[in-house]
């Protein structure tokens, strides 16, 4: 099939259609190998398509030359780009050149960026200039990377910075309280924990938030139109905020990506983002450059109930080392931030210097987070998965802690002394067959817990099957001290038990 399509294109038989079909035919390795064999001894025929009078032939040929990954095509592609008169074709040459060594041509491509920046934008050329500028940026970045800014915001400033901590929606008060204890002003907000402060050092210490988004001064809400949104953002305090948090202005642009959260379908979202990004580059005089592959900041555009946009800033320049120990994980691993939340919620029921057991330890996250908040005497982790236990050992070493991990089933585990606490993330299931097995696990769990816990000991459990825990804990002689809903969607609760008196 590849040979027939190629030979027909060479003979001038439906050249445009055959080259287009070739692009589809070479998406798998076999098709690509067939085309490579046809072209490698006759490069001139392929490059000859770039001289066609049909712009779509030139476009398809350029893209095929990029996919073939033959270094001999670099010069013809650059020459083709230089002389290409059709705006909609120009970005195809640039796309084709990605992956090739184009270092010697960088001055030329950077000069072209300057030319496009100075070009008057009209409704007719806007789309194609934006496409070419985006392709040029990606090509240049793929060759030399970006000049990254260093976050220097962990210190006291004269002006306040406002932001939002993203945390568990049902337990936001836990994070609010920690902020207040750090002396940070907490502001009313429903979608997270909003703060205003002149010192961001608390971001390194509070462990119960998953993300931080910054409020952009002068740009809280804007019209849901790409050009208007870009103009408002460019005229806001965004650049001042970025400079303040990164040690001042150094002449280097910030590279950004856009995340649009909206009811628009994917096609309309993509169109909006492209128009917004291109306009923002122009309005900011390319001190903000859109890059899908390598970026430092994210502009998060969120459609609100009034069909306008709230714009927030996410910084990838912040090195979040709170969970740097989490180097190994498995599919069922609980996220460290969730473990940290469970610990914070249960902390008042934990005892310092306790003997602690996690019978379903996974990669050790629960025990590691507990130790960070409330020091244990000795901690043991059990799991039937050898892979999980190996991961737990690596994570615990990375955390600078000591935990005794054993690749063993909790229900056959024996130990010479009793534990003060069982702290665990219980197994869970998503289908009825495994649910029957889970019922048996919960029944056996509480029976075995009686063998391993002191009479004053407590069970602190994260469960997606709280009804099973209620049933079998009562049968085994436990009473519930506390239940905290973590996720209504997943029926997940933090549950704390102790022996009936």
Spans of model-derived segments:
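Residues at or immediately flanking beta-strands
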Residues: 255, 298, 402-404
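Short secondary-structure junctions
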Residues: 283-286, 477
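Short coil/turn motifs at beta-sheet boundaries
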Residues: 158, 251, 292-294, 490
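Non-catalytic nucleic-acid substrate-recognition regions in nucleic-acid-modifying enzymes
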Residues: 98, 114-126, 130-283
């Amino acid at each position: 099939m590849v040979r027939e399509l190629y030979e027909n294109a060479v003979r001038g038989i439906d050249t445009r259609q055959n080259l287009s079909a070739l692009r589809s035919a070479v998406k798998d390795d076999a098709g690509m190998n067939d085309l490579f064999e046809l072209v490698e001894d006759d490069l001139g025929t392929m490059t000859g398509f770039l001289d066609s009078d049909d712009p779509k032939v030139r476009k398809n040929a350029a893209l095929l030359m990029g996919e073939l990954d033959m270094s001999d095509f670099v010069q013809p592609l650059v020459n083709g780009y230089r002389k290409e008169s059709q705006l909609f074709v120009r970005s195809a040459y640039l796309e084709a050149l990605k992956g090739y060594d184009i270092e010697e041509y960088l001055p030329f491509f950077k000069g072209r960026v300057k030319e496009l920046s100075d070009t008057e934008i009209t409704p007719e050329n806007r789309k194609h200039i934006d496409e070419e500028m985006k392709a040029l940026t990606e090509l240049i970045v793929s060759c030399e990377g970006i000049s990254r800014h260093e976050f220097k915001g962990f210190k006291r400033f004269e002006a306040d910075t406002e932001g939002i901590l993203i945390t568990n929606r049902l337990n936001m008060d836990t994070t609010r309280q920690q902020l207040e204890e750090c002396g940070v002003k907490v502001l009313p907000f429903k979608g997270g924990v909003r703060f205003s402060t002149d010192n961001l050092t608390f971001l390194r210490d509070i462990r119960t938030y998953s993300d931080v988004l910054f409020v952009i001064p002068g740009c809280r809400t804007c019209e849901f139109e790409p050009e208007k949104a870009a103009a408002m953002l460019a005229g806001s305090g965004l650049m001042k905020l970025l400079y303040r948090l990164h040690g001042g202005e150094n002449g280097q642009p910030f590279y950004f990506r856009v995340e649009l959260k909206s009811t628009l379908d994917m096609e309309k979202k993509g169109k909006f983002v492209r128009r917004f990004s291109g306009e923002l580059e122009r309005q900011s005089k390319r001190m903000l450059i859109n890059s899908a592959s390598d970026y430092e900041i994210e502009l998060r555009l969120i459609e609100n109930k009034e069909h306008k946009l709230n714009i927030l800033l996410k910084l990838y320049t912040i090195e979040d080392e709170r969970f740097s120990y989490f180097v190994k994980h498995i599919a069922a691993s609980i996220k460290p931030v969730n473990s940290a939340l469970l610990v914070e919620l249960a902390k008042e029921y934990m005892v310092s210097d306790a003997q602690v057991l996690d019978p379903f330890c996974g990669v050790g996250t629960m025990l590691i987070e507990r130790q960070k908040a409330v020091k244990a005497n000795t901690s043991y982790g059990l799991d039937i998965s050898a892979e999980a236990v190996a991961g737990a050992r690596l994570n615990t070493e990375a955390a600078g802690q000591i935990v005794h991990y054993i690749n063993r089933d909790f229900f056959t585990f024996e130990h010479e002394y009793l534990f003060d606490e069982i702290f665990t993330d219980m197994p869970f299931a998503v289908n009825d067959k495994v649910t029957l097995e889970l019922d048996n696990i919960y029944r056996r769990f509480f029976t075995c817990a009686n063998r391993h816990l002191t009479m004053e000991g407590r069970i602190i459990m994260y469960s997606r099957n709280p009804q099973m825990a209620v049933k079998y804990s009562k049968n085994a002689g436990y009473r519930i001290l506390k239940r905290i809903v973590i996720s209504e969607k997943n029926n997940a609760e933090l549950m704390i038990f102790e022996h009936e008196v």
